[in-house]
UniProtKB/Swiss-Prot annotation:
This is Small integral membrane protein 13. Belongs to the SMIM13 family. Residues 47-91 are annotated as: Disordered. The lineage of its organism: Eukaryota, Metazoa, Chordata, Craniata, Vertebrata. Residues 71-80 have a biased composition (Basic residues). Keywords: Membrane, Phosphoprotein, Transmembrane, Transmembrane helix. The modification Phosphothreonine is found at T62. The gene is SMIM13. It comes from Homo sapiens (Human). PANTHER family: SMALL INTEGRAL MEMBRANE PROTEIN 13.
Length: 91
């Protein structure tokens, strides 16, 4: 009697462990193959370690990083300056 109850509990616990292990492995593979490519998801999770998707930065990621490229800001101001001067009243 106690042998069958123990065996039932063992099978139940083993099944739960296998299901949890498969879920963790599935999320791990989904993260590394797909979700880690998105910068905002990495920031939400706080993953600052190995970022395999950053070896080839895309254009959108380089445009968002304004701290490393002050030339882009300067060129944008220079482009706006002639347009603004034409509308200002001379004093």
């Amino acid at each position: 009697m106690w042998h069958s109850v123990g065996l039932t509990l063992l099978v139940f616990v083993a099944t739960l462990l296998i299901v949890l292990l498969l879920m963790v492995c599935g999320w791990y593979f989904v993260w590394h193959l797909f979700l880690s490519k998105f910068k905002f998801l990495r920031e939400l999770v706080g993953d600052t370690g190995s970022q395999e998707g950053d070896h080839e930065p895309s254009g959108s990621e380089t445009e968002e990083d304004t701290s490393s490229s002050p030339h882009r800001i300067r060129s944008a101001r220079q482009r706006r300056a002639p347009a603004d001067e034409g509308h200002r009243p001379l004093t």
